[in-house]
Amino acid sequence: MSFSEKIKSLPDQPGIYQYFDENGKLLYIGKAKSLKKRVKSYFRFNPFRPADNLSPRIYKMISEAKDLNYIVVESENDALILENSLIKQLKPKYNILLRDDKTYPYIYIDLDEPFPMPQITRKVVKGKNIKYFGPFSSGASAILKTIYEEIPLVQSKSCLRSGKACLYHQIGRCLAPCEGKVTSREYMKYVDQAIELIHDKEKILEILNQKMQKYAENLQFEEAAEIRDRIKSIESAEIYSHVDLAKLEDLDIFAVEIFNKKAVVIRIFVRQGKVVASSNSVINSQTVPEIGEIYTRAILEFYSTETPFTSSKILVGDDFEEREWLSQVLSEKFGKKISIITPTTKERKSLIKLAKLNALEVIKNQKENTVLDELKILFNLQNTPYKIEVFDTSHMQGEATVGAMVVWEDGKFKKSDYRHYHLEGKDEYSQMRELLTRRAQSFEKSPPPDLWLIDGGKAQLNLAKEIIDSTGANIDVLAISKEKIDAKAHRAKGKAKDKIYFINEKLKVKSEKLNIDKLELSQSDKRLQFLQMLRDEAHRFAIEFHRKTKRKKDTQIDLLQVKGIGKAKMTKLLNYFGSFDNIKKASFDELKDVLNEKDAKAIKEFFKGQK
């Protein structure tokens, strides 16, 4: 069946459609209330060509399209959910994908518990009487730490289970409900104080400033510096505004600014009339994106995660076609009326103005991506690699085998997205296969990047491409390796040159699955130095985790040799303290509380002998 005949035979039902180019590469994913009507709207049929009323970006996409697939679903809402999920997983060439994939932390309290404790979450927590505060773009941990220092609440669920007062009670930072020293009713008064403090960021900052001043006066500079960092973390979430929202309303605000081929989405969160947090996403597009599609994508991506919805109004800077329908979708998802509105009052217009000013600042501060653009041209990449994931493995004679992934995005290493893995593979090839496969399996939760950079040669490049193709994602891949001297790859500068392996579609090689080419660049070449920097960071991170893993393993083996410390006691220690480092730091009394005096003494002697 020809392409045009396939389009004419589409069903008049809701679903998603996928366009592919002549090589079978995915170009675009869209949703439709009626597949037949929506897809036909892209074309003219006499002769068969793209419709005249398309935007430049969509016109270019349709000009490249040579085939399509579709999936029928029960409703338009189902189509929306499936479309959003597939776009994030597969990264089609012409879809808009926001760079900011993170979820935001909330502080929550489960008021159904007899002795509730504030905790941090990034998703909905099961429970009928959960109270959420946030979101926080930064400072959530700093706020929580301050609350626990000021108000004597339960600080660990394990304390309640133990039935014995812990160290926090001894220093006056817990009321010891585990020993019945406070009733649930009395305890709830302190919970109310904590809730008041969470709402009052100015009061928290006042408390912290007083503490910092006191530490400085007592020449306790390390403690003062820690408090200073906490203050900065809390303050950095603020966008200062002179807007006074007398109604003390809650709003989630989205605003978009487009400049040339760049677009910025700003999110601002207002709680009880105060701006409490903000974030932004940068969209780098090959062609100018449409503002309506950006709003739809930004709102969908933010609320597609299991994020608590603590507001009931979303304020947007511009009207767009799918606004009312999107309100219905979110209302169904969260089980309450959610309105997506444009500003009508002076105060709300001022908030949108504030958001757009911040968006322009983000655009102004964006660095030129010269090296990234040059890499795209040099290796004929599908997309400019704004986000790059770099992989390496590390082991010592097959022991403590680990893998590492580091991430480069928006002109810097994004350490919050770094990941390390314990690997089972016996050789470097199988280790890399395991590492890349495990990363690919998480594309649904953590969308793929523009480029994978692998530490290795042809075999690793072939392997990476095989795994990428199995997912259907649009990701470019490069491999970097040292030439071998005396059968060994030398990382030290001057001993050997780095080779870059890439897929060259113009190269015709019958004996291989892929047309793999290699390139040696001058040591002074900025493009090579950039790739080396990425590879070296992945190597550093892998080595660091390998050493830590080996130390931990060695410590565990040695500690088990201590008389009287078996696996059961080891498990008990780890469950209580959380890590070997914490066991090592624990005091004699803390160890004695978990085990007994004899074991505590043996463990302290063991760690003393390690120094």
From Swiss-Prot:
Protein's UniProt keywords contain Protein transport: no
Domain GIY-YIG: 12-96
Location(s) in or outside the cell: Cytoplasm
Chain ranges of the UVR domain: 202-237
Xref: InterPro entries: GIY-YIG_endonuc, GIY-YIG_endonuc_sf, GIY-YIG_UvrC_Cho, RuvA_2-like, UVR_dom, UVR_dom_sf, UvrABC_protein_C, UvrC
SUPFAM superfamilies reported for this sequence: C-terminal UvrC-binding domain of UvrB, GIY-YIG endonuclease, RuvA domain 2-like
Molecular function in Gene Ontology: DNA binding; excinuclease ABC activity
Residue runs in coiled coils: none
Entry keyword annotation includes DNA damage: yes
Coarse class of the protein's main subcellular location: cytoplasm
Alphabetical GO biological process terms: nucleotide-excision repair; SOS response
One CC-aspect GO term: cytoplasm
Keyword annotations of the record: Cytoplasm, DNA damage, DNA excision, DNA repair, Excision nuclease, SOS response
HAMAP family: UvrC
Subunit structure of this chain's protein: Interacts with UvrB in an incision complex.
Record's function text: The UvrABC repair system catalyzes the recognition and processing of DNA lesions. UvrC both incises the 5' and 3' sides of the lesion. The N-terminal half is responsible for the 3' incision and the C-terminal half is responsible for the 5' incision.
Family listed: Belongs to the UvrC family.
Protein name: UvrABC system protein C
Origin species: Nautilia profundicola (strain ATCC BAA-1463 / DSM 18972 / AmH)
